[in-house]
Amino acid sequence: MTTSLISRTGRVQSWLDNPESRLPVSCTVFVVEDSMEGPNGIEASWRFASHALRNGAGCAIHLSKLRPKGTETRKGDDVLVASGPVSFGRIYSVLNEVLRRGGTYRNGAIVLHYDLNLPDALEFIQTPRSELPWVKRCINITD
């Protein structure tokens, strides 16, 4: 006798019946590295979020590895200044808005995560909802 390791209810059954529709998962986490490029970089997280949202899944985007706002780094002769996690939060918000309004409504969501013990936590918390209307925010608290 064989048993199915997948519970055939809700989203999973819907996907098994029609694998062209929504993904059978509700939410996955993408930990963003402090780099624009690379498989776990900022740009890769945009592709990840876009794919999840277009297929009806949600995603959690963990922004705690990004450099704090105002941090200076050198690239050759140039001095680059980090814009911080909230600035990237605006991009995820717009991405979600555009994908939800463009064509068929999908039931995906984006939750931005940020660690409480980091320098930009207060800005992350206090940014008005009107500036990040299409994402939810979560502060990670540790002992």
Residue ranges and their predicted role:
Residues 1-143:
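Extended catalytic cores of very large enzyme megasubunits
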